[in-house]
Amino acid sequence: MSGISGCPFFLWGLLALLGLALVISLIFNISHYVEKQRQDKMYSYSSDHTRVDEYYIEDTPIYGNLDDMISEPMDENCYEQMKARPEKSVNKMQEATPSAQATNETQMCYASLDHSVKGKRRKPRKQNTHFSDKDGDEQLHAIDASVSKTTLVDSFSPESQAVEENIHDDPIRLFGLIRAKREPIN
């Protein structure tokens, strides 16, 4: 039993040294805290301390500061409400003449909602690289048609664009129009 006496002497010395360093550090921290409290009591002015109802608000608040901001009087007429109903109802839009609906469909600039298989066709490959005069005229006509389509898009009036945007403001109206397009007109 005399051969195994536990930990060697230098480990006990190291442990005692670390314990002493911990106690000294704790004493320094406590004395620093007490000294700081005394200085705060000596130099405390009423204007330096915030009242209970005051708090720090950043110029650019992040997350938590948003709810605590003091509301300023604002003119509510300046802002458009998100849940505002559009002027036209779904019934009025369905009663519109087919020619008006056709013009609205030609002016639609959004992606097609038709996901049927018939709309997904491959582009034909170019077979001939040498064109005759007749083929050249057809190409020029196709280029003119594509240019006229782009000028049509640019020539939309703001009122028609506003009507298209109003459709998306009201989900009930939007789904009504989608159902009306899917159902065949009798």
Curated annotation (Swiss-Prot):
Keyword set includes Disulfide bond: yes
Binding partners and assembly: Homodimer; disulfide-linked. Interacts with CD3Z. When phosphorylated, interacts with PIK3R1.
Annotated GO biological process: adaptive immune response; cellular defense response; negative regulation of receptor recycling; negative regulation of transport; positive regulation of calcium-mediated signaling; positive regulation of T cell receptor signaling pathway; signal transduction
UniProt feature, compositional bias: Basic residues: 118-128
Protein's name according to its UniProt entry: T-cell receptor-associated transmembrane adapter 1
Record's compositionally biased regions (Basic and acidic residues): 131-140
TM helices/strands, residue ranges: 8-28
Annotated spans, Interaction with PIK3R1: 79-82
Subcellular location per the Swiss-Prot or TrEMBL entry: Cell membrane
InterPro entries per the UniProt record, alphabetical: T-cell_rcpt-assoc_TM_adapter-1
Gene Ontology cellular-component annotations: centriolar satellite; mitotic spindle; plasma membrane; T cell receptor complex
Pfam families: SIT
Function in brief: Stabilizes the TCR (T-cell antigen receptor)/CD3 complex at the surface of T-cells.
Residues bearing the modification Phosphotyrosine: Y79
Positions in the Cytoplasmic compartment: 29-186
Keywords of this entry: Adaptive immunity, Cell membrane, Disulfide bond, Immunity, Membrane, Phosphoprotein, Signal-anchor, Transmembrane, Transmembrane helix
Region (Disordered): 116-140
Processing after translation: Phosphorylated on tyrosines by LCK or FYN upon TCR activation.
A GO MF term: transmembrane receptor protein tyrosine kinase adaptor activity
Membrane-related topology note: Single-pass type III membrane protein
Tissue localization of expression: Strongly expressed in thymus, and to a lesser extent in spleen, lymph node and peripheral blood lymphocytes. Present in T-cells and NK cells, but not B-cells (at protein level).
Modified residues (Phosphoserine): S46
Gene: TRAT1
Highest taxon of the lineage: Eukaryota
